[in-house]
């Protein structure tokens, strides 16, 4: 039986689920950009792209050279195709305007070009996260600049979401709202090939991912829940749990997606003015769509992430996502 490439899968989705052709083309362009980023990441020190770029992004985080390069790759790949009304990135303060010499399209692309880049110098898996929204008709113009308000849509409005993970293999994990598919990059063919069909998160688990060094700064419901996990078989949950933490959201969530578990990044008492660490629009929303499409759950502890009405492009939220049973338990502790 012939292998199913990403292009073939997307064409079949156009036939069976009425996926618009321009969305199909957009996903293919994003995938090509991810292949280019994968190539740069794999060069490591040989490519001269490791280390700091000597600048900070809008969050005040030091930008790595590969952050900047990955951002440029995604912008240049997507700006000219006529599928997008605008783009937004973790690495840019404001929305990216499609140059006037190119036509505009119906969609908005929001992305974290290189998630986990603080790990790049030590050769740990990193990735690209992206979200696709429709541009509201009221915000669309071929001639005028696109405002931030066009992007401020709840995650339920996403028409596609995905991530690429650059590890021992390069994988693209994608949802168009009809389940979650995993594609592995065949470097000989130069194509992403369908290798993981209809990914599902196990409902019950014995793994969790959280940065335990921050434990003293967590809110009481998180302290309670993690305490119960650590209590093991003798504790109230009646089983032993393993903790894993890579400090790369793509890598941590990919493990949760394939093996089950719960990923947690709660709010932190050291920064009471910030609701959390992870960004809603281009980290929490796309990952939540993927996890929910795979049968899991994703909340802030008090609210379903996909139902949050964004207030700003770089808004932060606490995140609890993964196996439904565990997410519902910790969410219940917050609400009780």
UniProtKB/Swiss-Prot annotation:
SUPFAM superfamilies tied to this protein: Carbohydrate phosphatase
The reaction(s) this protein catalyses: beta-D-fructose 1,6-bisphosphate + H2O = beta-D-fructose 6-phosphate + phosphate
Pfam families (alphabetical): FBPase, FBPase_C
Protein name (Swiss-Prot/TrEMBL): Fructose-1,6-bisphosphatase class 1
Subunit structure: Homotetramer.
GO cellular component, one term: cytosol
Family: Belongs to the FBPase class 1 family.
Leading EC class: hydrolase
């Amino acid at each position: 039986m012939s292998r199913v490439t990403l292009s073939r899968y997307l064409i079949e989705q156009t036939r069976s689920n009425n996926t618009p052709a321009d969305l199909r083309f957009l996903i293919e362009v994003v995938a090509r950009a991810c292949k280019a980023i994968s190539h740069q990441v794999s060069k490591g020190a040989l490519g001269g792209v490791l280390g700091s770029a000597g600048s900070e992004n809008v969050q005040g985080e030091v930008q790595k050279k590969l952050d900047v390069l990955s951002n440029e790759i995604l912008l240049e790949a997507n700006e000219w195709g006529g599928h997008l009304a605008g783009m937004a990135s973790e690495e840019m303060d404001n929305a990216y305007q499609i140059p006037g010499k190119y036509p505009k399209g119906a969609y908005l692309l929001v992305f974290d070009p290189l998630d986990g880049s603080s790990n790049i110098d030590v050769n740990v898996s990193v990735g690209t996260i992206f979200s696709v929204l429709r541009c509201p008709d009221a915000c669309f113009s071929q001639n005028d600049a696109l405002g931030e308000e066009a992007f401020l849509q709840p995650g339920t409005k996403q028409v596609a979401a995905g991530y690429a993970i650059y590890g021992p293999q390069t994988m693209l994990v994608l949802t168009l709202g009809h389940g979650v598919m995993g594609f592995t990059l065949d470097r000989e063919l130069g194509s992403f090939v369908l290798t993981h069909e209809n990914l599902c998160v196990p409902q019950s688990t014995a793994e969790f991912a959280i940065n335990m060094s921050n434990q003293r700064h967590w809110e009481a419901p998180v302290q309670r829940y993690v305490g119960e996990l650590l209590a093991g078989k003798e504790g109230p949950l009646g089983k032993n749990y393993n903790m894993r933490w890579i400090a790369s959201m793509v890598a941590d969530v990919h493990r949760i997606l394939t093996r089950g578990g719960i990923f947690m990044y709660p709010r932190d008492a050291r920064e009471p003015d910030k609701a959390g660490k992870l960004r809603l629009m281009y980290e929490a929303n796309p990952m939540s769509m993927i996890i929910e499409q795979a049968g899991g759950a994703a909340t802030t502890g008090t609210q379903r992430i996909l139902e949050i009405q964004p207030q700003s492009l770089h808004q932060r939220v606490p995140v609890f996502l993964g196996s439904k049973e565990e997410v519902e338990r910790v969410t219940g502790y917050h609400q009780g």
